């Protein structure tokens, strides 16, 4: 009679211990997945901040270019050599910034998906990132068109 009672106690203790180990293992796996999700989210937020900063640089360059274009069209009798030097420095800035942004965009577009399981926050940041990259591309085009207008106004 004692043997059956001891067996039941040992069996229930072992099954409780196994259940505890199973929950601990699942908890550690969930904690690892959560850490990966948080890491991916913060990485995406950093990339979004970085690209937004690039967009702001382009907006500043476009504003400067528009002011140069306005000054050139207002002052018909301006020193041509100074205008040409300013224009050449603008072209150099444009080429430098464009090459940097092309590299950044190609790295961001070709990078693999960060986590294998989707999460709403990461999807939201990814959509913001795609929007900012599209805005950056359009700003590059606007800057190039403004640069052409400035070149035409200097030459004429």
UniProtKB/Swiss-Prot annotation:
The organism's superkingdom is given as Eukaryota
Query: Where is this chain primarily localised?
Result: endoplasmic reticulum
Which Gene Ontology BP terms does the record give?
A: homologous chromosome pairing at meiosis; meiotic chromosome segregation; meiotic telomere clustering; regulation of reciprocal meiotic recombination; sporulation resulting in formation of a cellular spore
A GO molecular function assigned to this protein is: cytoskeleton-nuclear membrane anchor activity
User: Is-annotated flag, keyword Transmembrane helix?
Assistant: yes
What membrane topology is annotated for this entry? Single-pass membrane protein
* Gene Ontology CC terms: chromosome, telomeric region; endoplasmic reticulum membrane; meiotic nuclear membrane microtubule tethering complex; nuclear outer membrane
Alphabetized UniProt keyword annotations: Chromosome partition, Endoplasmic reticulum, Meiosis, Membrane, Nucleus, Sporulation, Transmembrane, Transmembrane helix
Q: Please indicate if the UniProt record lists Transmembrane as a keyword.
A: yes
Indicate where this protein resides in the cell. Answer: Endoplasmic reticulum membrane; Nucleus membrane
TM spans (from-to): 131-151
Q: What does this protein do?
A: Involved in chromosome segregation during meiosis. Involved in meiotic telomere clustering (bouquet formation) and telomere-led rapid prophase movements.
Complex and partners: Interacts with MPS3.
Its name, as the record gives it, is Chromosome segregation in meiosis protein 4
Species for this entry: Saccharomyces cerevisiae (strain ATCC 204508 / S288c) (Baker's yeast)
């Amino acid at each position: 009679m004692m043997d059956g009672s001891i067996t039941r106690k040992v069996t229930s203790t072992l099954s409780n211990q196994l259940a505890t180990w199973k929950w601990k293992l699942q908890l550690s796996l969930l904690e690892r997945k959560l850490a990966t999700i948080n890491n991916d989210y913060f990485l995406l937020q950093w990339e979004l901040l970085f690209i937004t900063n690039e967009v702001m640089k382009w907006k500043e360059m476009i504003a400067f270019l528009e002011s140069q274009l306005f000054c050139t069209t207002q002052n018909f009798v301006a020193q041509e050599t100074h205008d040409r030097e300013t224009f050449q420095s603008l072209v150099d800035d444009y080429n430098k910034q464009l090459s940097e942004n092309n590299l950044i965009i190609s790295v961001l577009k070709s990078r693999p998906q960060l986590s294998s399981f989707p999460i709403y926050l990461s999807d939201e940041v990814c959509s913001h990132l795609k929007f900012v990259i599209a805005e950056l591309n359009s700003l590059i085009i606007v800057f190039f068109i403004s640069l052409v207008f400035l070149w035409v106004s200097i030459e004429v």
